[in-house]
């Protein structure tokens, strides 16, 4: 505060390690980060790891629901629009999907708040609702207000990802349906359902997995906008507040965790790629 003396300021700088040069501070940060210690928040005066653990459940639950909606509806609508590509419903869905691709996330959130919260009054416009604490985890899945509060943020965050996955699945499936082995499967007398889902969809998912995996990482990384619009108490809103108050330890910890998360997601995607694509397994077997 303004009433602090110069001695108090210097004492606080020494306590936080800010009196050291950049390289010493950076080394101490990396040393602590490896052990899960990201220092102390300048604003709250509490360990950053403790603050992140408190906020993580909100973001992870929001990301899980958004990701589930994006994958489930994205794949289903992508398959439908590919199979019924000349139908009115498929063309209507593709036209409407342009909204999800074109509109920015914050505008989608504001429109949903205006419609369902302000005009209709069906759903809350901010906050997480009532939560239940299970050990160190807080969840809103077990309360009605928690589930209601989750609907609008989840739709806002997952809509762009859903339309992206849908259009990608449609494009890939149309390409697969033109392949010779699909024509051969139909010539053998297989049912259309078996051709579409057992053969076409399985091969469609191989290239889709890579993009979908990265998009799931983006859901967590870029939940900042959605959490800000809905004042959702997750790590994204924590990061925005840290920027406003120049809380460097919180900012550094958030960016580092997001980077580690993307590396982990890429590893999982590569493993799934190997499990689904038989050509990769055949290449590895042939190499031995």
List each model region and its residues.
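N-terminal signal-anchor/first transmembrane alpha helix
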Residues: 1-19, 49, 53, 80, ...
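Amphipathic alpha-helical recognition patches that constitute DNA-binding helices
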Residues: 21, 25, 29, 47, ...
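An internal, D/E-rich "acidic patch" concept
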Residues: 19-75
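Alpha-helical transmembrane segments of integral membrane proteins
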Residues: 56-89, 105, 133-288
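Membrane-water interface segments at the C-terminal ends of transmembrane alpha-helices
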Residues: 20, 28-31, 96-127, 149, ...
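Short hydrophobic, aromatic-rich alpha-helical segments embedded in or entering the lipid bilayer
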Residues: 4-36, 182, 231-242
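Hydrophobic alpha-helical transmembrane segments of membrane transport/permease proteins
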Residues: 1-27, 116, 120-143
